[in-house]
């Protein structure tokens, strides 16, 4: 029988800690996985103690997922190379702007049979334009990478409330392996082969959620927010089709949890919506609100809107994506929040 697969979780924020609860529990039950799960923790001090030591003694991430115990077989490791040493399965769940540096650091220390899955909701811009996070990991580390996206608010997953998720995998065998690692009776997973679209959904919906939050801050009501969701979905589909490498975008993928379901839950319950609402109401900067509302964690929606805007500008396509553009300009160019409504009124869908 093959040796059990060693698992490393790269990241330990709110979502990383929630997913560690599932992985730790499944690794204890399933013989194909090594019982000990290493979780890389970006070391910081919390109430005078190292976060990694708190996690390993109290079995709780008191900073990013307070109130939820982690299984005792999940071990916090502050040195990334130590955490990833000999790992067969890598679960990436860090803010997308750090992924290149982390991959560089892990080079040469993972197993020869290593495979990865990214839960990172973001994209990058390279010299040729759009760059998916999975592509960066694949190129830097030379491993196959699947993606998991879905309507998965971290605290609800941690509380074991029922939800669905989608794995996109170009190698079906690897997608099914990660399904075994991650699925529970309350976290149900579908595996599809349209991996790039699954990943794009996870990134682009955060831009739409910022727009939904602006509407909430302006007290526009549910009808307006429904329009933001619909027009945002149209722009997500158009963007995916525009940038697909091989015309492989399937409309059916947008009906999976990674698509319309994730879009709805994020526009009603996610942190991007919440911070955008506060931005509209208070006039404080995104950076100030991240510190106040997210313990300093980075908000992905505004960052992704900037990356998308630069890609669209490079391609001369800004005017075809007015909702994405409005979010970027409100966040970064001091345009008034009310421009969100103007963009809906004059959206090409209505002309």
Curated annotation (Swiss-Prot):
It is found in: Cytoplasm. GO terms for molecular function: glycerol-3-phosphate dehydrogenase (NAD+) activity; NAD binding; protein homodimerization activity. Keywords: Cytoplasm, NAD, Oxidoreductase. Its EC number is 1.1.1.8. One of its GO terms (biological process) is glycerol-3-phosphate catabolic process. It comes from the Eukaryota. It catalyses: sn-glycerol 3-phosphate + NAD(+) = dihydroxyacetone phosphate + NADH + H(+). The keyword Electron transport does not apply. The keyword NAD applies. Substrate binds at residues 121, 271-272. NAD(+) binds at residues 11-16, 154, 271, 298, 300. Pfam families: NAD_Gly3P_dh_C (PF07479), NAD_Gly3P_dh_N (PF01210). InterPro entries: 6-PGluconate_DH-like_C_sf, 6PGD_dom2, G3P_DH_NAD-dep, G3P_DH_NAD-dep_C, G3P_DH_NAD-dep_euk, G3P_DH_NAD-dep_N, NAD(P)-bd_dom_sf. Its main location: cytoplasm. GO terms for cellular component: cytosol. Disulfide bonds: none annotated. The active site is at residue 205. Belongs to the NAD-dependent glycerol-3-phosphate dehydrogenase family. Plays a role in regulating cardiac sodium current. This is Glycerol-3-phosphate dehydrogenase 1-like protein. It comes from Danio rerio. The gene is gpd1l.
